[in-house]
């Protein structure tokens, strides 16, 4: 059986053993010296595809490092795993399912069978259904209970039904369709619903309830709150169908809620939530930017899919990024990875990538049920630059941990103000440069002497001004954020995550830890509300329940 389904000991593979020795040889490697010694280093460690330009030259690597990492990808059978995932094999072993989010962006005419049925016609049927709905709303033909056109769309969903769509609709706000505003309601916190309700009017609002089961607790509670609010504002049960539609595989529950069957968009069990923005879950995206731009998003992702499948591993963007992550996580003991977008409209990409990466690769068990033999997924964190430079970048530069980083920056701003974007771009490049170069003790001392300080003051302050440098980063550059390029960018990270799961032997498409929390939450709720007097399984949880019950009013 293939390694990706029944993994052996990856640490015993020749390439892994060679990488272990190579890591020791790289202990004193200096990126500064590497750039000085090799004027062609930049050209050797850059590539472009699907509208993205990747500079990975500021990494603790040589050509030999890359060769060994690529050899590891070959030894774990990555090529076969990529093909298996793309053509619908059961790569999600714990749930016995394929993982076919890539099918959502495949063109008409392609064929892909799941359980003997070609799914591509269904994919495009749903796209046509979305096109019709989006057209009616944008043309003012979909009317609320007072016959006024829809002006606001509220997506009710959580996790993958929220993070991906929010990222894309906000990243592409420059492409927004005038006349329709999109909002997101995710958290089961009354304050979020309250704040939203102050911005919309029931008579001109359409709610999209996005839940595969139509039973996700947070989503269902928010949908019920929205329904009650709609009725309290003057809406009626008879006209409910004008204001609520659903994306779900549980038609019966959606119909019972009051949604007409023709206004229910399907979900398939071969698409995981965190990979679902390409499906009808992306309805708020299409409503925000228009269906033609949504299809451009799909097209960009498809272009990256083709690159991922066909490019040699040493020229394959997702594969190289994945291998670099393995290099730092498993051989340099890096525990986290920073995502640093230098673009205001990409401010939510870190949140989406947190779910994509950490929910996929936050695993300690391999596909066959045996314990993982290596560290697996890192903590993903970060935020928009240049704000981070005045917050956590200090830790990146002078902290004791190695934290690789991805800088993401466009060349062109949609909203140029004086020379702001030149400064933003300069800040992005200078941060990656500073991480790589650092500042030596000799440089720090010389700098202080040039300021006229006494030698005593120089020796006292110089240690604090030393920056270790040699901190790795990648820089991803796009000409400007467009639907096509954003689609390619998100798809690239999806593929990166999958590659790492193959190497570690884990399943990137389940999330049993999330399920446990849901189950326990129901039991705690029953104890909080007096539904059961049976004590919790531990004294801490029971003590906190008692504390709540003794003080909660309302």
Curated annotation (Swiss-Prot):
UniProt catalytic activity: alpha-D-glucose 6-phosphate = beta-D-fructose 6-phosphate
Pathway(s) served: Carbohydrate biosynthesis; gluconeogenesis; Carbohydrate degradation; glycolysis; D-glyceraldehyde 3-phosphate and glycerone phosphate from D-glucose: step 2/4
Annotated active site: 359 (proton donor), 390, 518
Pfam families found in the cross-reference section: PGI
GO molecular function, one term: glucose-6-phosphate isomerase activity
Superkingdom as given in the UniProt entry: Bacteria
Record keywords: Cytoplasm, Gluconeogenesis, Glycolysis, Isomerase
Alphabetical list of SUPFAM superfamilies matching this protein: SIS domain
EC numbers: 5.3.1.9
UniProt record, GO biological process: gluconeogenesis; glucose 6-phosphate metabolic process; glycolytic process
Localization per record: Cytoplasm
Leader sequence residues: none
PROSITE patterns attached to this UniProt entry: P_GLUCOSE_ISOMERASE_1, P_GLUCOSE_ISOMERASE_2, P_GLUCOSE_ISOMERASE_3
InterPro entries (UniProt xref): G6P_Isomerase (IPR001672), G6P_Isomerase_C (IPR023096), Phosphoglucose_isomerase_CS (IPR018189), SIS_dom_sf (IPR046348), SIS_PGI_1 (IPR035476), SIS_PGI_2 (IPR035482)
GO cellular component: cytosol
Enzyme class: isomerase
Function: Catalyzes the reversible isomerization of glucose-6-phosphate to fructose-6-phosphate.
Matches recorded under PANTHER family: GLUCOSE-6-PHOSPHATE ISOMERASE
Family the UniProt entry places it in: Belongs to the GPI family.
Protein name per Swiss-Prot or TrEMBL: Glucose-6-phosphate isomerase
Organism whose genome encodes this protein: Pseudomonas syringae pv. tomato (strain ATCC BAA-871 / DC3000)
Gene name of this polypeptide: pgi
């Amino acid at each position: 059986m293939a390694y990706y389904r029944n993994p052996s000991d990856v640490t015993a593979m020749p390439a892994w053993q060679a990488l272990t020795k190579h890591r020791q040889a790289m202990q004193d490697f200096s990126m500064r010296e590497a750039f000085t010694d090799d004027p062609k280093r930049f050209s050797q460690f850059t590539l472009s595809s699907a509208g993205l330009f990747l500079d990975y030259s500021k990494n603790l690597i040589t050509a030999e490092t890359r060769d060994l990492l690529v050899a590891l990808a070959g030894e774990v059978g990555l090529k076969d795993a990529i093909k298996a995932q793309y053509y619908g094999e059961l790569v999600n072993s714990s749930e016995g399912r394929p993982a076919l989010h890539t099918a959502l962006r495949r063109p008409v005419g392609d064929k892909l069978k799941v359980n003997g049925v070609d799914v591509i016609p269904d994919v495009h049927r749903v796209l046509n259904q979305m096109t019709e709905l989006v057209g009616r709303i944008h043309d003012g033909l979909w009317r609320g209970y007072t016959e006024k056109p829809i002006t606001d769309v509220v997506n009710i969903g959580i996790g993958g039904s929220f993070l991906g769509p929010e990222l894309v609709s906000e990243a592409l706000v420059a492409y927004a369709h005038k006349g329709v505003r999109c909002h997101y309601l995710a958290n089961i916190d009354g304050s979020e619903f309250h704040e939203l309700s102050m911005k919309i009017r029931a008579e001109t609002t359409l709610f999209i309830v996005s839940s595969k089961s139509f039973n996700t607790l947070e989503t269902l509670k928010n949908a019920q709150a929205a329904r009650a609010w709609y009725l309290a504002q003057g809406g009626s049960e008879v006209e409910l169908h004008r204001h609520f539609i659903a994306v779900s595989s549980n038609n019966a529950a959606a119909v019972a809620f009051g949604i007409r069957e023709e206004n229910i968009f399907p979900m398939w069990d071969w698409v995981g939530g965190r990979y679902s923005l390409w499906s009808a879950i992306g309805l708020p995206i299409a409503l925000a930017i228009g269906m033609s731009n949504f299809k451009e998003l799909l097209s960009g992702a498809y272009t990256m899919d083709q690159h991922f499948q066909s490019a040699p591993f040493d020229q394959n963007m997702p594969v190289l990024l994945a291998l670099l992550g393995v290099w730092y996580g498993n051989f340099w003991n890096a525990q986290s990875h920073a995502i640093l977008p230098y673009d205001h409209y990409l401010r939510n990409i870190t949140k989406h990538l947190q779910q994509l990466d950490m929910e996929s690769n936050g695993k300690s068990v391999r596909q066959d049920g045996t314990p993982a033999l290596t560290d697996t997924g890192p903590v993903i964190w970060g935020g928009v630059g240049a704000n981070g430079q005045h917050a956590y970048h200090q830790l990146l530069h002078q902290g004791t941990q190695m934290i690789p980083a991805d800088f993401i920056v466009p060349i062109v701003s949609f909203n140029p103000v004086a020379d702001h974007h030149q400064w933003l771009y300069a800040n992005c490049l200078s941060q990656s440069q500073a991480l790589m170069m650092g500042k030596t003790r000799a440089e720090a001392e010389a700098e202080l002497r040039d300021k006229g300080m006494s030698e005593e003051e120089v020796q006292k302050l110089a240690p604090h001004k030393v920056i270790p440098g040699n901190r790795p980063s990648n820089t991803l550059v796009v000409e400007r954020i467009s639907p096509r390029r954003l689609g390619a960018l998100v798809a690239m990270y999806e593929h990166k995550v999958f590659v790492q799961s193959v190497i570690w032997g884990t399943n990137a498409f389940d999330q049993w830890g999330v399920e446990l929390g849901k189950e326990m939450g129901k039991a705690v709720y029953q104890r909080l509300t007096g539904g059961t007097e049976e004590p919790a399984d531990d004294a801490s949880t029971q003590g906190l329940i008692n504390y709540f019950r003794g003080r909660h009013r309302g």
